[in-house]
Structures are given as structure tokens and as C-alpha cells.
């Protein structure tokens, strides 16, 4: 059908009616649950043949039930036939959507919005404004003391205003409150893997023993019977110079003897600068901290 010109798939609005184009797509299903036509053979849900079969089946079913013959099978053939009749439609200059509420079909409401904004002032709502101001606010809502209802010919329709009895004014608005329950912690943040927040501080004097040697410096610190700390500092000064590095490189190795049972050397801090290379090691007794 597609190759013979009897079936078309159009991506766009094709409705033709006295009111012009109203953005309605051509379709043969009315339940709005039709699957889209997937015409890319690379897609896993390619369904051109399936949709063609559905359309043909729907057309045959409609013809058998309603005894209607489709003389124009495609929008293009229908349009060509309309052009062939050489029929001219009168020029339409009034509202294309007279029964709709489109923004370009109704009167402008900006002035009414301004008047309503003024009427929502707290004095206007409670009636505590001056009498002259109250009259002015009422006139702005009406916009004219000679306002009337007119028919399609512009003639005034006879009308009468009847007072409403037992009128209740709904609330002007509402507020929503959300209550959250939270527990306040004065510390602000608990201790974790990257932050240590002690529950207090210890004030006291620790016993220090300082060993100062030509290569190694040590500080022994006894805080209490079960807290004992040793801080060692080793300085290695090895100046190099006067040789060419084009044929190789200079490597410096350090061999550190074991400290004893359960103690290890750990690189706790390192910073590489131009000269020298600073490494700091600390003795650790905890295997997990190695």
C-alpha cells in the first residue's frame, strides 16, 4: 500500500475543517493507546508491518460493519481531489475557535488581575479603608458603572442582579507545616575514620626522657602505666653532585632492621620537594595500623 501510494504515514497535523488546522493528528484509533510506528529496522521493536496490518484490518472491519467505501485513501489524494474541484471557501476573519477558551479568543484579563490584587489588600478585605477608597476599589472590579451583557449583535440583553443568600466565602489560602524531630549534638560531628573528636582533654605533665645522639634522636614519653610513647628521628644527609646523569640515575636505598616483636616501621608522612626528600617513620604496635 505504501509503495502504491494508497497508504501514508504523516508526522504532522492533517485535519481539514472549516476552522482550519487545529493540531489534530491523523489517526484510525480513538482510544489513544496506539503504539508508535517504529520504522528503524535496527530497533528491537520494529513494527512497520504490524502497524500496516492493523490499519488494513481496521479498514476492512469498518467497511464490513458500516458499508462505507474509502474513496480517498491518503491525505495527499484527498487534498489533490479538493484542489481539483476548484472550490473557493469564503475568507474567515473572526474567531477560529469561538467555543474554545484559548488565550487569543477571550478578552484580556490583565486589568481584572490588577483590580483583584488591590482588592486583596488587608483594608479592602476587612473593610477598614476609607469610604471613598472602598468605592474606588469596587469600581475597579467592575471597571465601568455602565457594564452590561450584550448578545452576538452587540445589543444589550435585559438582565437583573439577584442577591445571593447564605453565601459563604471559602478560605483565601492555607499553610502547610512540616515538623521534623532531630537530636542535637553539641559536638557537631562524631568521631569517625577521618576525624577524631575526644570526649574531653587530659591535663598533666608527662615524664620525658630525651636521648640526643649524632645520628638518632629519641624522646621517651610516659603518660601513665599503660600509655608509653617513643618518638625517634633519624636524619640522613647525603649530598650528591659533580656527576652526569645522562647515562643513568642515582638511587638511594634504606634498610631498617626490625624493631622487635609486634613492632613495625610505617611511613606516616612524606613530602617530596626539590631537595631534600623528607620521610617520617613512626613505630606502630597495632597490626591494623601497618
Curated annotation (Swiss-Prot):
Thermal properties of activity?
Answer: Optimum temperature is 65 degrees Celsius. Activity decreases sharply above 70 degrees Celsius.
Task: Identify the keywords attached in UniProt to this record, alphabetized.
Answer: Glycoprotein, Glycosidase, Hydrolase, Metal-binding, Zinc
The record's free-text note on cofactor binding: Binds 1 zinc ion per subunit.
Q: What is its EC number?
A: 3.2.1.24
Q: Which residues form the active site?
A: 17
The first-level EC class reads: hydrolase
Cystine crosslinks: none
| Activity regulation annotation text | Inhibited by swainsonine but not by 1-desoxymannojirimycin.
Q: Which reaction does this enzyme catalyse, per its entry?
A: Hydrolysis of terminal, non-reducing alpha-D-mannose residues in alpha-D-mannosides
Q: Give the glycosylated residues.
A: 64
State its cofactor: Zn(2+)
An example GO biological process term is: mannose metabolic process
pH dependence (record): Optimum pH is 5.
The Swiss-Prot or TrEMBL record annotates one GO molecular function as: carbohydrate binding
PANTHER family recorded for this chain?
ALPHA-MANNOSIDASE, LYSOSOMAL ALPHA-MANNOSIDASE
What's this protein's function?
Liberates mannose from p-nitrophenyl-alpha-D-mannoside.
Tell me how this protein assembles: Dimer.
Q: Which family does it belong to?
A: Belongs to the glycosyl hydrolase 38 family.
| Annotated protein name in UniProt | Alpha-mannosidase
For this protein's source organism, the top of the classification is: Eukaryota, Viridiplantae, Streptophyta, Embryophyta, Tracheophyta
Amino acid at each position: 500500500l505504501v509503495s502504491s501510494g494508497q497508504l501514508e504515514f504523516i508526522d504532522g497535523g492533517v485535519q481539514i475543517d472549516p476552522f482550519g488546522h487545529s493540531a489534530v493528528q491523523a489517526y484510525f484509533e480513538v482510544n489513544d493507546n496506539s503504539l508508535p510506528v517504529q520504522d528503524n529496522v535496527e530497533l528491537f521493536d520494529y513494527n512497520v508491518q504490524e502497524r500496516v496490518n492493523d490499519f488494513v484490518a481496521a479498514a476492512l472491519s469498518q467497511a464490513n460493519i458500516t458499508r462505507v467505501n474509502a474513496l480517498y485513501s491518503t491525505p495527499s489524494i484527498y487534498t489533490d481531489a479538493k484542489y481539483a474541484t476548484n472550490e473557493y471557501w469564503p475568507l474567515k476573519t473572526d474567531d477560529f475557535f469561538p467555543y474554545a477558551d484559548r488565550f487569543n479568543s477571550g478578552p484580556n484579563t490583565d486589568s481584572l488581575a490588577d483590580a483583584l490584587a488591590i482588592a486583596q489588600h488587608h483594608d479592602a478585605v476587612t473593610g477598614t479603608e476609607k469610604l471613598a477608597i472602598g468605592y474606588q476599589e469596587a469600581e475597579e472590579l467592575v471597571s465601568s458603572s455602565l457594564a452590561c451583557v450584550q448578545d452576538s449583535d452587540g445589543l444589550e440583553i435585559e438582565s437583573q442582579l439577584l442577591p445571593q443568600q447564605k453565601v459563604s466565602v471559602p478560605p483565601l489560602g492555607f499553610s502547610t507545616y512540616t515538623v521534623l524531630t532531630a537530636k542535637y549534638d553539641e559536638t557537631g560531628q562524631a568521631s569517625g575514620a577521618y576525624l577524631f573528636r575526644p570526649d574531653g582533654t587530659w591535663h598533666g605533665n608527662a615524664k620525658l626522657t630525651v636521648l640526643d645522639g649524632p645520628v638518632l634522636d629519641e624522646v621517651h614519653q610516659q603518660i601513665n602505666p599503660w600509655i608509653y610513647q617513643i618518638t625517634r628521628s633519624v636524619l640522613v644527609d647525603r649530598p650528591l653532585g659533580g656527576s652526569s646523569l645522562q647515562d643513568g640515575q642515582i638511587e638511594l636505598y634504606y634498610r631498617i632492621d626490625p624493631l622487635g616483636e609486634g613492632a613495625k616501621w610505617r611511613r606516616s608522612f612524606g613530602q617530596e620537594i626539590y631537595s631534600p626528600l623528607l620521610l617520617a617513620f613512626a613505630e606502630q604496635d597495632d597490626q591494623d595500623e601497618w
